[in-house]
Amino acid sequence: MQLEATELKAARDRLMRAQGQIMGIVKMIDEGRDCTDLLTQLSAASTALTRAGFTIIATGMAHCGTDPEGTANREKLEKAFMSLA
């Protein structure tokens, strides 16, 4: 099932932020920046990606975690959450 773009705006915003952070990390590597600075930015980008994933899962639970009959499918929900681990 496809989610509406408006439902995923928060996740998209986080992904765009992470994209900027990743580009910044690449630039820092090219410039030979200190590894401590790199690790700080890597941590921030990783957190942004993780939160975007959780936002997508939370938004999609009502859509993706239900059977065609409209009943909750626990296995689908667990699989979606475990994919983020």
Feature roles, as predicted:
Residues 1-85:
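Solvent-exposed interaction patches of small proteins and small membrane subunits
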